[in-house]
Amino acid sequence: MSAQGDCEFLVQRARELVPQDLWAAKAWLITARSLYPADFNIQYEMYTIERNAERTATAGRLLYDMFVNFPDQPVVWREISIITSALRNDSQDKQTQFLRSLFETLPGRVQCEMLLKVTEQCFNTLERSEMLLLLLRRFPETVVQHGVGLGEALLEAETIEEQESPVNCFRKLFVCDVLPLIINNHDVRLPANLLYKYLNKAAEFYINYVTRSTQIENQHQGAQDTSDLMSPSKRSSQKYIIEGLTEKSSQIVDPWERLFKILNVVGMRCEWQMDKGRRSYGDILHRMKDLCRYMNNFDSEAHAKYKNQVVYSTMLVFFKNAFQYVNSIQPSLFQGPNAPSQVPLVLLEDVSNVYGDVEIDRNKHIHKKRKLAEGREKTMSSDDEDCSAKGRNRHIVVNKAELANSTEVLESFKLARESWELLYSLEFLDKEFTRICLAWKTDTWLWLRIFLTDMIIYQGQYKKAIASLHHLAALQGSISQPQITGQGTLEHQRALIQLATCHFALGEYRMTCEKVLDLMCYMVLPIQDGGKSQEEPSKVKPKFRKGSDLKLLPCTSKAIMPYCLHLMLACFKLRAFTDNRDDMALGHVIVLLQQEWPRGENLFLKAVNKICQQGNFQYENFFNYVTNIDMLEEFAYLRTQEGGKIHLELLPNQGMLIKHHTVTRGITKGVKEDFRLAMERQVSRCGENLMVVLHRFCINEKILLLQTLT
């Protein structure tokens, strides 16, 4: 028998004995190895027995022997590959843990050599990168030799694979795993331009990761049912997984914290003017403002260095705080446990003073049954005031019940605005920031456009805000699936109310009403009218005039519909109380004044005075929409001798009836009787839900309402 045949016989005999007598099998193999020490199959069979018996130390020694003595055997490398895969695996099963333990028994030098050789045999870029990353983590001394090369390979792979989003497996491995190893190792020498390149890549990745649902999740989840303003977008509870990575590897804890740590390390390596210790975002911004003041005093090299410091520091403060603001007012855009429960908010001009600016001589006309409370508070300022002043410190009214962390949210809004202003305050900052934004395609970020729109509204630049809202609509169209007819998205409804508030601030009252009336189609009824304004409890009254205040309102029918009615009242009020007679506008005002009664009582009395001065009044929709008992009593009184015998044409076709017939005592009496019966019927309607009545008014009379403002 040949030597090869002898070896095969001995190995086969040992295999047969394994199930019956393990020790006998091992004895056969020990004998065989003594006889044929250069035979690989004998060594491998011994290793297999020990591995299957999960004897870590013995299996490790045998694997080491094979690695040293038979380095060219494919079976050895297949075994090593299985072990290194277990090292990268998140699984905690028994077999995986055994393989990890087996690897740990090997000498460090051998581990390092094994990982390097396995890496060389990987043809898949991602697998090769993960293998090399394993080496860098276990043997930090290898970072100097392999760290930058691995980082560049990952960035190159991202380009070659034509990844659409910065949130991809290659960028994630580079930013979260490789980059910290490189920049925190002071033996790795990196030029400043490479550090800035890496900081840029990290910032783009983390910002897109945090805000990823805006661009990614909506595409996968399709149309969302947002038939009511009140309903935040429904969201998937499934965890986000980056393609090519495991679920565990895709989750990043404290991404903002990680990003600012990278900023600090890069800053120290580039010799920026750094502060010791942890500083708030406000402190960072303040420091950057100071640095900008004496930028021109530096030589060109220092100027370039500090320019990068200001741009990157301010930019990250901007994006962090802009995100914080949008995440608080519209959490459904982003992932998070609070997303389904919190109602979104929308920033609008405050028109709650719509009932003000009325000066009345009460002695001219006071109903005998009406006693006005002497101490009733009057609103001091008027919505007619110029609200478009581009103030830097406008007051934002917000109800803490609707936004518990309102102080922090408004502070984030302020810091983001100031950061934005700083980035555009100097030409060289503007140029660099614009370059970065173009590369990152920030004009496609829906969440950022929401912030920018609110910022522009805050600044009082309403024409720009309208353009921004149209940009927002275009973004929503490119991201969202087509909606079911009649179910406008939450974003579409937010845009309508913000368009209305901007047109109003510009004095474009017909456009204001057009947007408001479009929005009325989305209102979900019934809404209870509690008499008092919905925003009244939340109002914190500033010491100075509040003509240019803003407010954050919940995106619910209950909050938005009263606001819409305020806007309409403000539009028609201006037309109704001019010197020119406009009974239609005056009638619309009277209908709208029913909301929050008796807050609009003074304005109603002004309307009554105007009617008295005219001596007559025609509004044929009166009995369709006026159900307020005080108003009905007042109009009934106007027809009496004591009330001035005012000629009122409030019934449909009443004018035609009188015009086309000879006015006889009988017909006049008939008209009076019709008026009396209509008034009695109307009194019986006083219990109707006022919001339903006013909603019907807006829907049914849309054409008439818009014609009145033409």
From Swiss-Prot:
Cross-link (Glycyl lysine isopeptide (Lys-Gly) (interchain with G-Cter in SUMO2)): K464
Gene Ontology terms: biological process: regulation of transcription elongation by RNA polymerase II; RNA polymerase II transcription initiation surveillance; snRNA processing
Keyword Phosphoprotein: yes
Membrane-spanning ranges: none
Cellular location(s): Nucleus
Chaperone recorded as keyword: no
Cited Pfam families: INT10
InterPro entries cross-referenced by the UniProt entry: Int_cplx_su10
Modified residues (Phosphoserine): S231, S381, S382
Family of the protein in this entry: Belongs to the Integrator subunit 10 family.
Task performed by this protein: Component of the integrator complex, a multiprotein complex that terminates RNA polymerase II (Pol II) transcription in the promoter-proximal region of genes.
Protein name: Integrator complex subunit 10
The species this protein was found in: Homo sapiens
Lineage: Eukaryota, Metazoa, Chordata, Craniata, Vertebrata
